[in-house]
Amino acid sequence: GWFADNWLPIIQGKRLHKVRAKETIMCVGALEQQAVFRNNDLPGIMLSSAAQRLIHLYGVRPGTTAVVLAGNNDGYGTALDLIDAGVNVRAVVELRQQPQYDEVARAVIDKGIPIETGSAVYEALAAPGKNHLGSVEVRKIAGEGRCEDNGVTLQCDLLCVAVGYTPTYQLVCQAGGKLSYDDDSAMFTLTDLPDAYQIAGSINGLWNLDAVRADARRAALIACNAIGTVHQEVPAAVAARDGNSPNFSWPIFPHPQGKEFVDFDEDLQIDDIINATRDGYEHVQLVKRYSTCGMGPSQGRHSALATARLVASATQKTIAQTGVTTARPPFAPERLGHSAGRSFYPQRRSNIHYRHIEAGAQMLQAGAWDRPAYYGPPELRQDCINAEVNHVRNKVGIVDVSTLGGIDVRGPDAGEFLNRFYTFGFV
């Protein structure tokens, strides 16, 4: 999480580092979002980035026969990765009516993979006798969230979904940044960043690799100039987008029989979100608490955007007005062992600590502070305490309570104010 004054607890392996940063650069990327359709929770349905991770990081072929649901050009990269891994790609179901193909998309077309433009997966069907994806029903899109009455069924045991992203906004919002929504790109964006705080890369709405690198270099120069390690001119901001957004505006397709899951953690369907608004819980914060959407292990990472879209539609508000629920620390689960930390505490000493030592004080731990317990050798502890008590009682004593803090009382009636609750008179 992020805490006041750029205090960042960072977990690395078994250790928690407590970092107080002068400047912070967040390059935490974006979170891929799911499409919402009937039976979208069947095993065999996964995000395109999940399929790519299985292939490239773990060397696992995620299926044998695949369909790719694409609302952006990233889906075509996934299709090529699947082909290279030995998966038979039946088709790319393209949500966009008129997609702008890049080189990767054209490479998929050149391989003879059918592209079903302006279409959606309306329903996923389990294989007979199995609780696993067996086929998908593909229909033409008739309008926002609506499909035509008839379609075609494609046999497959793998469906890869690439319909958009949302920035990993949690830490930035904890620091005071604001989350807005850009209707043109159908994406959440981050604005009003606090001082000493930079973002770069896909969290900043950049997707091209060269643009991401340039943005990171710019953020680093701003931070390094601020702390004085370099003195270089900062280049102009990288163009935020090239007009080809990775987000499809409405990958949500209700089905009369339900089971179109918005939040997989809490088994929440489209109707659960809509009914919450009909019951009077129209604010997205209340929708969360009434429906428990976003309260599971993923903490809304994969449901916040779809929920905001549904709540906005149901309440006749914009998605920017609807927003998302408050992101609070911790961002990721932390073990009790991390919180326990090492068995030591900071040593705090008053301004006259060493004068106490010169006077023969034996120190004790009072909270976080070293304070004198008594003056004299430990073997004469009780005698020393008795002598100090007698001295203070019969003569005078001075005690240093600066370690306890203080209250600054000002004003013409300050003295009378103190007189009224202290056991002695100040004035």
What is the meaning of each model-derived region?
Residues G1-R349:
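Residues forming the flavin
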Residues R15, F188, L286, Y290, ...:
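Basic, glycine/lysine-rich polyanion-binding surfaces/domains
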